[in-house]
């Protein structure tokens, strides 16, 4: 991917900040934003803060949790200004290939919709898998932008450093909003980020192998209590179905109270997350091992009320 550093990319105080500034720069009250469900909550919240309407697109297991915009009605398309995509995905761990991004760019160009790709987990991948970027697609910069973050790539969560790249007009609009809200990034943080980017990248292979080991520990622990989850190719999460007879909230609460193990109920990420848990791979390996040991020792019966469909 080639970018004009003066026009087609800008630094952010973390990509989350950029999500909110993007919506302030590009949306008007009454505009529609197409948001996945389940999804990272700031996509929806930032749109609502800008006065926009949110139209959700369900991520379905039978479609490998890939967005399908074919069902969006003509009326919604006329008012739609943004579409959020996020692969490797939070919370599902799903990935998207180059053809998906080609279709997304074509969809955005056809309907005048800005395609907003959140690629925070683009460098957290396993078993030789290499995630694609939407900006690799020819013509993408005419209708797309991409967020990246040092938080996940370089283990720098809390340093608050990210980037927005792609469409030059959108980059300029975000810079204008930012110039009225913040005064830039601390020089020490930018120096650390530059050192991370310019330094030896081979350690990322070892780091990702560590995440893959934790992923396998989680999958084995879940299988021991009858939960079969799809092994993610990338991201920091395992997206696991809850046992029959449980809701996401009820099972997460049961795990916390009975075993002391904390999982995120899928409903935190939207109604489409019902029936699932998000399990993070960010804890130390020894803690993951202990959590799975406790999971294996858990014995109880499901509640009387069935899990909602």
Which stretches of residues belong to each language-model region?
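PLP-dependent class I/II
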Residues: 1-309
């Amino acid at each position: 991917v080639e970018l004009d550093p003066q026009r087609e990319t800008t630094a952010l105080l973390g990509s989350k900040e950029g999500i909110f500034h993007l919506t302030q720069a590009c949306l008007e009250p009454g505009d529609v934003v197409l948001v996945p469900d389940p999804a990272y909550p700031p996509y929806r919240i930032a749109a609502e803060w800008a006065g926009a309407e949110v139209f959700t697109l369900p991520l379905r297991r039978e479609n490998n949790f890939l967005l399908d915009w074919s069902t969006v009605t003509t009326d919604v398309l006329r008012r739609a200004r943004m579409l959020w995509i996020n692969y490797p995905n939070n919370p599902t761990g799903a990935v998207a290939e180059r053809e998906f991004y080609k279709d997304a760019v074509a969809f955005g160009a056809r309907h005048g919709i800005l395609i907003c790709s959140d690629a925070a987990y683009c460098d957290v991948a396993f078993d030789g898998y290499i995630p694609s970027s939407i900006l690799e697609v020819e013509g993408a910069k005419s209708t797309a932008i991409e967020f990246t973050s040092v938080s996940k790539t370089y283990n720098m969560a809390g340093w608050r450093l990210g980037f927005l790249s792609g469409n030059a007009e959108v980059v300029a609009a975000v810079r204008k909003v930012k110039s009225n809200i913040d005064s830039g990034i601390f020089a020490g943080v930018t120096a650390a980020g530059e050192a991370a980017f310019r330094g030896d990248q081979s350690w990322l292979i070892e780091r990702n192998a560590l995440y893959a080991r934790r992923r396998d520990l989680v999958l084995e622990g879940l299988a021991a209590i009858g939960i079969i989850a799809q092994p993610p190719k990338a991201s920091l999460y395992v997206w696991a179905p809850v046992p029959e007879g449980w809701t996401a909230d009820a099972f997460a609460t049961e795990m916390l109270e009975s075993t002391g193990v904390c999982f995120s109920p899928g409903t935190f990420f939207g109604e489409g997350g019902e029936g699932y848990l998000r399990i993070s791979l960010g804890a130390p390996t020894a803690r993951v091992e202990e959590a799975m040991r406790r999971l294996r020792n858990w014995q109880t019966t499901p509640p009387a009320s069935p899990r909602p469909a």
